[in-house]
Amino acid sequence: MFKLKQWLIYLVCSLVIMNTEGLFVNITFVRNAVAKGAVCLDGSPPAYHLDRGSGTGINSWLIQLEGGGWCNNVTNCVSRMHTRLGSSKKMVENLAFSAILSNKKQYNPDFYNWNRVKVRYCDGASFTGDVEAVNPATNLHFRGARVWLAVMQELLAKGMINAENAVLSGCSAGGLASLMHCDSFRALLPMGTKVKCLSDAGFFLNTRDVSGVQYIKTYFEDVVTLHGSAKNLPRSCTSRLTPAMCFFPQYVARQIRTPLFILNAAYDSWQIKNILAPRAADPYGKWQSCQLDIKNCHPSQIKVMQDFRLEFLSAVIGLGRSSSRGMFIDSCYTHCQTETQTSWFWQDSPILNRTTIAKAVGDWVYDRTLFQKIDCPYPCNPTCHHRVFTPLDAPPI
């Protein structure tokens, strides 16, 4: 009976995936990018996937920046350059578009007929790096900022220059990039274009880990230094703080002039695994079972995570009140909710104030309603889709 139930669950999930990911979009390599030095870690050209809009959405654009962490030293950047996160040679030719990228109204009611773009991530520093020199021993190229500009210029030439609406979105490292590039994206478009930015799971918190060490601060310092990112971070932040601090949204977002929507889990699974309890702070693996499934967490670990949530909320609320900043902070153990159909818009999607993520974002983009809600603490929200991992899923940084 148990095996039959498991098989039925697998079948239903498979049908959901088949139905919602029916659209596969071809890859496009950026023309003349290599000549401009706008390249992935391995020197290959950057890439994106574009599905053209139609009808009422023909002059509206949604740009989704791919996530995938960062590389903070030569060794892990060399490893990365042999994967899709460092080389367009390793990227799939056809990419499934679902959730916020879906072309079906029933799965993506507000953006289904927009021009929808997935910008591939292959620079390892959230599209911020720019180092001219290339070490011949490694052939590593740190050119994320050039990649960003080259892709945007090509999209402008393909019609984005005529956009009536434009949303810059992204997940994880892409969510951080959508936040940091928000105002520069606005500057690329005509004054008459309505421009907004959405950061999904990109609000990485500057905090100490369970051993009391500022692990993520040191990690970001290494990323910014290696990639030469300082000159490409928002000047409104770098004029006040060290460049590495400007990799943290809590020090950047207040100065962003373009309307911004922050979508994040207060118990973000990536942050729990890599900021709160990274491997270096947990040498005996006491947090491993908890990180794989929040239901396995000991009460003392839940207490630490509740404190993390309060610190996260303090950073978000500390941005100050804004009549243009949207917010959907749920209490789910998850990461990236715009790219998964069941989180974005489904019969049992996570809700706050009886509102799905897709509706909250859509209402904000179209100025129907300003959504600014923070969930009650775990485990109060029964609509959450808590992620369950295996030890092989995305090993910690």
From Swiss-Prot:
Q: Which GO terms describe its biological process?
A: cell wall organization
Signal peptide (from-to): 1-22
Protein species of origin: Arabidopsis thaliana (Mouse-ear cress)
Provide the GO MF annotations for this entry.
Answer: hydrolase activity
Q: Does the keyword Secreted apply?
A: yes
Gene that encodes the chain? PAE8
Write out the coiled-coil annotation as residue ranges.
none
Q: Which PANTHER family match?
A: NOTUM-RELATED, PECTIN ACETYLESTERASE 8
Question: Which family would the database say this protein is a member of?
Answer: Belongs to the pectinacetylesterase family.
For this entry, the protein name equals: Pectin acetylesterase 8
Instruction: Name the job this protein performs.
Output: Hydrolyzes acetyl esters in homogalacturonan regions of pectin. In type I primary cell wall, galacturonic acid residues of pectin can be acetylated at the O-2 and O-3 positions. Decreasing the degree of acetylation of pectin gels in vitro alters their physical properties.
InterPro entries named in the record: AB_hydrolase_fold, PAE/NOTUM
Can you tell me which residues are glycosylated? 73, 353
Active site (UniProt): 172, 268, 335
User: What domain of life does the UniProt record list for this protein's source?
Assistant: Eukaryota
Q: Where in the cell is it found?
A: Secreted, Cell wall
User: What is the documented disruption phenotype for this protein?
Assistant: Reduced inflorescence stem growth and increased levels of acetate in rosette leaves.
Q: Which Pfam families match?
A: PAE (PF03283)
Q: Which UniProt keywords apply?
A: Cell wall, Cell wall biogenesis/degradation, Glycoprotein, Hydrolase, Secreted, Signal
EC number of this enzyme: 3.1.1.-
An example of a Gene Ontology cellular component annotation for this protein is:
extracellular region
